């Protein structure tokens, strides 16, 4: 069966969105039918994702594949244009995987289940579209599509300060989106032709100062979503009020949109400007790692502690992105996928713990490990993954970024030594705050007031299944990284070569080598 010409990506994007529109008319009284319907749609869409890439995607091809383009507004060269390469393909698979598990994690939701699952499925299609669309205006539209579902998930199903957290989220992200729109319009109308096609935009000859201005605009927008300090303050508040399924989507997918867009837009379209901004990004990455780790250590609220841990781990993505090495960029992509899995697992377990203890304050916990041994074991395993224990995906990703940056010839030796040392400090801080978190929750003397007022039952099969599904790829990638890296290495190698050509010193060295090679005598003739 020839599937090469089938509109896979369009089907994968539109299926959950179309399915969400049917939810209001499905007969259901207590929400049980709706949740099974949403889970079935999620599983079908994820199966389509896996099948499409298994049958129609070539790992050795660095260019866009599964390409579809349908005219939308021909006068402005606006098209429904989608495609996938090594950067987007792992994140599309991650989106399908995490969203399907988040649907299962939402099983206890009883408040407005129709609206909840409608938003979940709408987000499903929108998030895949972010990683697949190849038209800048379309990218802006699907980027904005994510704001409304996340806002409502926070504002309706969040905690006591949900309105504050939701409003802060929408102000930050909508404000950042303005920079995407302005930069996209400016690029589209630059030069003799008007186009929003990303590949065409990358071929335009922008003046360097113009590139720097565009790069700064995109950086502000994507730094909010990643997030990069100091544009991070919305995330701890959002995580502090979100429910477990919303946590999984925030940590597992939403943050990756920022990292993906930085690589796709800033590096892919504006490589010359990237050469000037890269040292700044490295410094910002180090600040993310150290500052967020120290702040996480000081947090007494469990959700905020894990939220700052997420910010710290995303610092490795920034440094790998700015390393100008194949290994560093490969590590950055691997870290995005790894953190998506680990972050989703930790926040799911935080939600499971809160459902039983009804508190997020570490001072009010203690000694619950004896009463909840399964949750204790799963929390420990996922924490080990987060602190980059060898044999788990986090270790491989961070090691690749370490070695990739340390071997980069785009920076001075002194700068590299300082950065690697500070990265190592951040890695050392991670087990300190995570192990102390485990000790405060599960070890020590039981809080008698907590035990007497709450029924501390252990994990149910549904919860064990969700964590098992997340741990399998975490451990699988940890022992055999090629399982994932082979999917995108061809694309990252091609992009790194282009980025290295944009660095004046590296480009000059390349020209010198080429000149010497051409002028050297041929030995053996």
From Swiss-Prot:
InterPro entries, A to Z: NADH_Q_OxRdtase_chain4, NADH_Q_OxRdtase_chainM/4, NADH_UbQ_OxRdtase, ND/Mrp_TM
Bilayer topology term: Multi-pass membrane protein
Keywords assigned by UniProt, alphabetized: Membrane, NAD, NADP, Plastoquinone, Quinone, Thylakoid, Translocase, Transmembrane, Transmembrane helix
GO CC term, one of those recorded: plasma membrane-derived thylakoid membrane
Catalytic activity: a plastoquinone + NADH + (n+1) H(+)(in) = a plastoquinol + NAD(+) + n H(+)(out); a plastoquinone + NADPH + (n+1) H(+)(in) = a plastoquinol + NADP(+) + n H(+)(out)
EC number assigned by the record: 7.1.1.-
Pfam families hit by this protein: Proton_antipo_M
GO annotation, biological process: ATP synthesis coupled electron transport; electron transport coupled proton transport
Record's function text: NDH-1 shuttles electrons from NAD(P)H, via FMN and iron-sulfur (Fe-S) centers, to quinones in the respiratory chain. The immediate electron acceptor for the enzyme in this species is believed to be plastoquinone. Couples the redox reaction to proton translocation (for every two electrons transferred, four hydrogen ions are translocated across the cytoplasmic membrane), and thus conserves the redox energy in a proton gradient.
Annotated family: Belongs to the complex I subunit 4 family.
Identification of the protein by name: NAD(P)H-quinone oxidoreductase chain 4-2
Source species: Nostoc sp. (strain PCC 7120 / SAG 25.82 / UTEX 2576)
Lineage: Bacteria, Bacillati, Cyanobacteriota, Cyanophyceae, Nostocales
């Amino acid at each position: 069966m020839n599937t090469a010409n089938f509109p896979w990506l369009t089907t994968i994007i539109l299926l959950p969105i179309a399915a969400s529109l049917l939810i209001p008319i499905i007969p259901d009284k207590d929400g049980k039918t709706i949740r099974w319907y949403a889970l079935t749609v999620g599983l079908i869409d994820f199966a389509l994702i896996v099948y499409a890439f298994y049958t129609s995607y070539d790992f050795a091809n660095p260019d866009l594949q599964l390409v579809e383009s349908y005219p939308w507004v021909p006068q402005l060269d606006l098209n429904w244009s989608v495609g996938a390469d090594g950067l987007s393909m792992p994140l599309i698979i991650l989106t399908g995987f995490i969203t399907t598990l988040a649907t299962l994690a939402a099983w206890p939701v009883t408040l407005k289940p129709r609206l909840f699952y409608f938003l979940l499925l709408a987000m499903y299609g929108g998030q895949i579209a972010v990683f697949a669309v190849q038209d800048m205006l379309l990218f802006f539209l699907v980027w904005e599509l994510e704001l409304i579902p996340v806002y409502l998930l926070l504002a309706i199903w969040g905690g006591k300060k949900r309105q504050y957290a939701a409003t802060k989220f929408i102000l930050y992200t909508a404000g950042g989106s303005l920079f995407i729109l302005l930069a996209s319009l400016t690029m589209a109308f630059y030069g003799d032709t008007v186009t929003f096609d990303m590949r065409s935009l990358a071929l335009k000859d922008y003046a360097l100062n113009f590139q720097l201005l565009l790069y700064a605009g995109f950086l502000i927008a994507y730094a909010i979503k990643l997030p990069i300090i100091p544009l991070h303050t919305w995330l701890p508040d959002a995580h502090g009020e979100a429910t477990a399924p919303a946590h999984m989507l925030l940590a597992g997918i939403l943050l990756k949109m920022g990292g993906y867009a930085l690589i796709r837009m800033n590096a892919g379209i504006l490589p010359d400007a990237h050469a000037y901004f890269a040292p700044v990004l490295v410094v910002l990455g180090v600040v993310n790692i150290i500052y967020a780790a120290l702040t996480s250590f000081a947090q007494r609220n469990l959700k905020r502690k894990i939220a700052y841990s997420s910010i710290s781990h995303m610092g490795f993505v920034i440094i790998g992105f700015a390393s100008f090495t194949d290994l560093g960029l490969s590590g950055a992509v691997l870290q995005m996928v790894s953190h998506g899995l680990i972050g989703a697992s930790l926040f799911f377990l935080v939600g499971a713990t809160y459902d039983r203890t009804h508190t997020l304050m570490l001072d009010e916990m203690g000694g619950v490990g004896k009463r909840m041994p399964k949750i204790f074991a799963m929390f420990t395993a996922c924490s080990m993954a987060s602190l980059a224990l060898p044999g788990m995906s986090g270790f491989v990703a961070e090691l690749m970024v370490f070695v990739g940056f340390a071997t980069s010839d785009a920076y001075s030796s002194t700068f590299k030594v300082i950065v690697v040392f500070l990265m190592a400090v951040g890695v050392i801080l991670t087990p300190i705050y995570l192990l102390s978190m485990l000790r405060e929750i599960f070890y020590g003397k039981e809080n008698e007031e907590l035990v007497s007022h709450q029924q501390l039952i252990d994990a149910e099969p549904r919860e064990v299944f969700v964590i098992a599904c997340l741990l399998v790829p975490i451990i699988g990638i940890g022992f055999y990284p090629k399982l994932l890296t082979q999917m995108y290495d061809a694309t990252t190698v091609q992009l790194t070569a282009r980025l290295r050509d944009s660095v004046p010193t590296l480009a000059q060295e390349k020209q010198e080598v080429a000149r010497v090679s051409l002028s050297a005598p041929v030995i053996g003739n």
